[in-house]
Structure formats: C-alpha cells, structure tokens
Amino acid sequence: MKIRQICAAAMAFVLLLPSVGCGKGQMRKDLDAMTAAHEMGVGINLGNTFEAFWADENDHTAGASTIGENTPQNYETCWGAVVTTDECIDGIAAAGFSTLRVPVYWGNMMADDGTYQISADYIARVQEVVDKALADGLYVVINIHHYDEFLIKHHPQDEVLAAVGTVWKQIAEQFRNYPDHLVFEGFNEALGTPQDGTELTEDETYDYVNRMNQTFVDTVRATGGNNAARILIASGYWTNIDLTTDEKFCMPEDTVPDKLMVSVHYIDNSFYWMNQIGGERWEQYSTDQCNLLKARFTDNGIPVFVGECTSIYEDSHFIQNPRTEGSSACLQYILDMAADYTFVPVLWDVNDNFYSRTDCRISSDSDQAVITEVADRIAQKEYTGLPSLCILYCFNREI
C-alpha cells in the first residue's frame, strides 16, 4: 500500500472516532500525541516517593525488602519523602505545572512467589494520588521505575518480557477506564542494560530495547477500554538522547495511529560535575541535544517527553564568568528551549527541594516566576495540530 493511501486512511480513522466520557473524566479518542504534548506544558516529578524501595537481592520476584508494618506509606516515605497530601497536589497545579510524573516501583509489597502480582494496597495508594491529580486537571504519567532495572539485571530476556507483560497488564486493567489525562510511560532508564554476567552486541541490545517497548504497547492495548486509544510513551535506550536517536532504536508498532511519544532524560551531569554550567559549551550541548531529538522524532511527528531534567543548579558548579548565570536563569534557558522545540519538559524533584511538599509551593520566587512565564507561553502558543501523521504512522515499518 502506498504511504499516501495509508495516511489518508489513518487520518480518516482518527477524525471519525468520537470522544468518550468516563466516570473520572473525558476520553477523547481523537486526541493525538502532539496535541497531548502541547497540553502537557511543563511537568514535575513526584520523585523519591512511590519508586522508593529497599533492595533485597535474595528476593527474585520483588527485589525489595519489607519495610516497617508493610503499608504503602512505609515505602512512600522510605527515601525521605512526606506522605503525599491533597494540598501538595493542589499546590503543584496552582504553581503552573500541567503534568505530574509519578514514578513507581511496583515490586514493593509484592510476594516472592514468581507470579509478579502487584499488591492491591500499593496500587490503590498510587491510584489515590492519580485520582487527586486528575481532579486538579493535571496530566499524570505513571511508569515502571527501578523495578525494570531489577528485572533486567536478574532474569534472562524472555522471563523479563513475560514479567513486564504481567505487570503492565495489571496496571493497565486497574486504570483501563481512566481519562486521556492519564498517560502510561513504559519504563525508566534501564532499557539497554544486560542481565548481570552477560554481554550483548549493539544490535542485540537495541533489539532488546525495542522488544521491551513493543511488549509494553501490545500489553496495554490488549486490555481494551480507554487503553485502546490511550497516549503511551516508549522509553529510550537508557533514556540517553544520543543512543535513542540512533536509527537502531525503533518506535513500537501500534494498533492506532499517532498515540505514541518517546521518553528521554536531559542529563548535563558532565558539565555539572566539571563546574561548567552556564558556559558556552553547556549552551551548545543543550542545543545539539535538542536538534538530535527534533530531527529524529519531532520532525517525524513523534512528540518528545523529557521525563527528567535538572531543576536546581548549585552556584559551586557554574563556570567562571558564565553566559547564563544563576540557577533560575539556567532553568529559564532549558525550559525556553524545550518550549521552542515543542518538547514536554518534566523537572526532576524530590521532597522539599525545588517544590516544597510541606509548604505546598515552589521554594524559590524566581523559580516560580520562570515556571509561570514558560507555562503561560506554552499555553498561548498557537498549535496547528498533527504536523506529520503520515510519517509517524509509517515510521520504522516496511511499506
């Protein structure tokens, strides 16, 4: 079939789909990934919270120790976070964020019996936070976080793929009737890691990464309901921009067009630890990374979800006589660039760091001003809809 015919059919299919309401909000089945990315604005992570765990190498199913009385709150707070309150989430929405990323270690409270059965109490606690964030009008992104790394390092590929399918099936079924503001992100930073004691060639590694993402998409779609058209985020190779923009990384095939994003993390650690933040090389590196993503994904109709990017730059890590001086100025620089490239920037944050979960506000007034300005600019930016549905639908497929 010619590309033009496929694209015409795909566009007609999308336009004919009705919007469907559900008990917890609206499911717009005609919502495309690019439109969703625009609506997601600026985001923040609920970091060191539901992805927190105490490792247990002897537990081959959960990979985690039992903490305290084995309640969800024991794990939610084990890395220093406070219990997530309604007021905390209200403050996130009021600060101008449009997206809350909730990383989750699903092995917490899981029995070591090889069934990979998620704890009903644990997923119910995650659901409480998701419900509150959705009620506040936020997009919510949940994933498999750190648990993917445990599985990959301790089990052979086929067992990992089966376990991932089992875990994602449970998550997807729990949230199958949720609205389109709930987005699933497959994994965190572990794709590309081999099992301990083994080695993979470059081609084998990319194949493993691609199989993991395909298993995620296939599993979620098979649960039906609103998941049949939900926006999904495929995770990059280590979420590394250089590795993920390589042609060997393939976006998963999907049963519906234009419902996929790709996830990477903006990591400028080398400049941070070499005390080069704010200099010309740091600025050029940031631009070069954005250009790689634009050429590989955005220009091909695939939105880029930057699931973690730096929120605070300490003064001691700046270059002498920086061109971009001060943490808030660097934040402005990175968020402005993300907005210009139409990426979804999500700040990495932990308890009482950038955003205070006890005071329920952004800790710095100058940082708050940056978030307000960038969020407003994204919201007011004219968006014309699907830029390249045809290329996206045919991306990495034989025609």
What does each model-identified segment do?
Residues 1-10:
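Bacterial N-terminal signal peptides that target proteins for export
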Residues 18-21:
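C-terminal motif of bacterial Sec signal peptides marking the signal peptidase cleavage site
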Residues 24-99:
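N-terminal carbohydrate-binding accessory modules
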Residues 79-99, 117-144, 153-186, 209-221:
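An active-site-proximal structural segment forming one wall of the substrate-binding cleft
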Residues 106-124, 146-162, 192-201, 276-277, ...:
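Surface-exposed, active-site-proximal loop segments in enzymatic domains
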Residues 162-278, 291-312, 340-343:
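Active-site region of glycoside hydrolase catalytic domains
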Residues 287-290, 294-373, 386:
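Substrate-binding cleft of secreted/luminal carbohydrate-active enzymes
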